Amino acid sequence: MLHARIAARAFNTPLLVEPSKAMAFLSGLGPRILGRRVELADLPVVAGDLGAGALPARASLLADPLSDRLRQQGDAPYAMVDGIAVIEISGVLIHRGSWIGQSSGQTSYEGIAAQIEAAAKDPAVRGLALEIDSFGGEVAGVFDLADRIRAIRASKPIWAFVAEHAFSAGYALASQADRILLPRTGAVGSIGVVVMHADLSGQLDQDGVRVSLIHSGQHKVDGNPYAPLPEAVRADIQREIDVLRFLFADTVAAGRGGRLSQEAALATEAAVYRGMDAVAAGLADEVTNLTRGFASFRQALGAPSTSKLSRAFSASHLKPKKEAVMASKKQPHDTPHDTDLEFVEIT
């Protein structure tokens, strides 16, 4: 199997992503990761020609946290508009990434946490605006970050602005804001969990390759890609993701308060809701042009109108310079290549 680190984060592990992204992942990167054609729903998927790119180095969650480095450098890791810290959450959401903003189609939970914590401690920040456009990402790290966002809103108002998509892990974070605003075409939801399993046994048989797994422990090689998925293992995975779905719904309910209960979140059955349907279902609070919605946030804070509203949602102003906050030590030998991880969120 090629690109083992990517495969390990994409297959046989629960992810909070919108299902269509799983199809995009398998279509675009599946053949390159697995080293052979991928068949999905009886349809062959052929390898595409994707560019190669290196990812930033990882950072420890316990030592030298990213937020400490930001304070030492004295840089504000967010755009500021009339006392509002604008924090972009876009692309694939991943665990353990030591950078701010989007990099190679990814945004890290660690980076988002550093931004919101810095904003919470900054006396110049009167409120936080989460600008979200994401189909989701990894389960690991998302619920802890959701809890941190919910805790911070007790001291500073937080509004979520859905810049078209807040699905799965993206919605887990959006739901922790005081208010969720989206445009007419914006969509939210996908409160569910998905796991992908790759069965390479048929292709290996055709290639004359037989893999023997010598292991100690009955469940040590459960879900391995060299054999069809046994029903007992499938049932174990199903139980695991069902538990995670309940945790997901409970987290959403904690963030939404009386607007969406855990039972109602589960009753969505991971559906997505667009525009007014999202408001009617309790997954969002208002359908509006995001520039007008941002003006409403400023008005609610009593901030003076000292800058153009269009700046709030202009990519040239919103994206922090990640070069200033990259990890100081890179590890090229530990860096995956040949991937646009815009797709890895999808499993």
Each model region followed by its residue ranges:
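N-terminal organellar transit peptides
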Residues: 1-347
